[in-house]
């Protein structure tokens, strides 16, 4: 599966990236809104999400506002992040919404309520770019993601050796 992240910060950069999607022929697109210079403005962010949705056509779109503590491109307020998630879910502009496991069960349940009755799926993610956690931690993290309500459990780690 090929996933192409769109990481432009301005509308022009984002649309330029979106215009190149057909030549790459990905299976899915990840909209990295934590790169957007206007991310704190929900109306502008929703308008941009609509434009990308239109440009993506039938390709599935993941809406991701990665926390800076897990590799996000900049600090984004929770208010802006979850307001965008709420509005994007209302309009069914995306196919997946990605929320970090660190937000905990209450916030994850809130996102599940946002997408209830829609065809949007929840990705619950965990990232460790310093190391690969021990096998037991990998399995317990994935289990926690599933218990929290993930439709897709995602764990990304940095390999440091061949083991």
Task: Write out the residue ranges for each language-model feature.
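Active-site mouth loops of central-metabolism enzymes
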Residues: 1-15, 67-79, 125-136
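Glycine-rich, proline-tolerant flexible connector loops at the mouths of alpha/beta enzymes
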Residues: 28-52, 99
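Catalytic alpha/beta core domains of metabolic enzymes, predominantly
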Residues: 96, 101-163
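Active-site-proximal loop/turn and secondary-structure-junction residues that shape catalytic pockets
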Residues: 8-10, 33-37, 65-69, 101-103, ...
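Hydrophobic faces of well-ordered beta-strands that scaffold small-molecule active sites
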Residues: 1-6, 27-31, 61-65, 95-99, ...
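Generic structural signal for well-ordered alpha-helices
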Residues: 15-19, 42, 46-53, 85, ...
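Alpha-helix-loop-beta-strand connector modules within alpha/beta enzyme cores
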Residues: 42-68, 111-124
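Glycine/small-residue-rich loop that forms an oxyanion/phosphate-binding "nest" at active or ligand-binding sites
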Residues: 61-99, 103
């Amino acid at each position: 599966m090929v996933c192409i992240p769109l990481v432009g910060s301005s509308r022009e950069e984002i649309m330029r990236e979106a215009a190149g999607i057909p030549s790459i022929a990905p299976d899915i697109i990840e909209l990295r809104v934590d790169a957007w210079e206007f991310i704190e403005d929900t109306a502008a962010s929703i308008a941009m999400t609509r434009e990308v949705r239109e440009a993506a056509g039938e390709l599935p779109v993941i809406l991701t506002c990665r926390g800076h503590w897990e590799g996000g491109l900049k600090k984004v307020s929770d208010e802006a992040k979850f307001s965008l998630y709420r509005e994007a879910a209302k309009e069914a502009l995306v196919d997946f919404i990605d929320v970090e496991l660190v937000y905990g069960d209450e916030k994850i349940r809130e996102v599940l309520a946002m997408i209830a009755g829609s065809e949007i799926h929840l990705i619950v993610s965990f990232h460790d770019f310093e190391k690969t956690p021990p096998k037991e931690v990998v399995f317990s993290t994935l289990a926690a993601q599933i218990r929290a309500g993930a439709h897709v459990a995602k764990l990304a780690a940095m390999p440091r050796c061949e083991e």
